C-alpha cells in the first residue's frame, strides 16, 4: 500500500465499526498507530505468536519472505577495548543500533594454536549471563574451536567468549523497521526519531494485517479515553 492507501483505508475501516461518537484521527495519530502495529506484527511473526501465520520466522520460506526487506548483514573486525568482561577470554564488538533479532552469526578464529584449522569459522551461540558459569567449562556447551559464546550487555554491544583469538564477527539480523509516516510531520513531532514521510518497507502481503491491527489499536486507545465501547 502507498501512504495514501494506508490513510484512506484507515479512515474507511475505522468508520466501518460504527463507533459513537465517531473517532477522528489526524495523520500523525494514524502514523503512530500504524508504526506500533507494524512493530507488533514483526515481533509476532518472528516469534511465531501470530495466530494468522502460525509459524516463526525460520520455519518456512513464506514467513521469511514477509520480513525479508528487513534482513541485513553486518561484518566487523574492529574490537572495542576498555570493557570489563565476565571472562578472561571476553572480546567485544559493536553491533548496529538497529539490530532487533540476530538470525545467524559466526566468528572467524585466527590463532596459531589452531594449526591447520587457523581461520576456521565457529558458530556463535547466544547464552544468558546467568548460564555462563555452568557452561564455560562444559565441553559440550563451552567455548571451543567450533563454538563461541555471546553475551548481550547493551543493545549495540556484543561480548564474545572464545578459547581462541576472534579475528572477525559476522552476523545477519532483522533490523528495526522505519516508521510508517503518512505525511511530513509538523515541527516538534517525530516517530522513532523520524519526522519526514516514509512508507512501509515490509512485504506488501502483510500491509493489510498492519492496517487492521492499527485500527484495532486506535479503537482500544480512544474508547479507553472516552469510556465508550463498540
Curated annotation (Swiss-Prot):
Coiled coil: none annotated. GO terms for cellular component: virion component. It is found in: Virion. It comes from the Viruses. Its main location: virion. Keywords: Virion. The barrel is composed of five stacked dodecameric ring structures. Podoviridae-like phages usually possess only one such ring. The tail is thus rather long. Homododecamer. Forms the tail multi-ring barrel with ring protein 1, ring protein 2 and ring protein 4. This is Ring protein 3. It comes from Bacteroides phage crAss001.
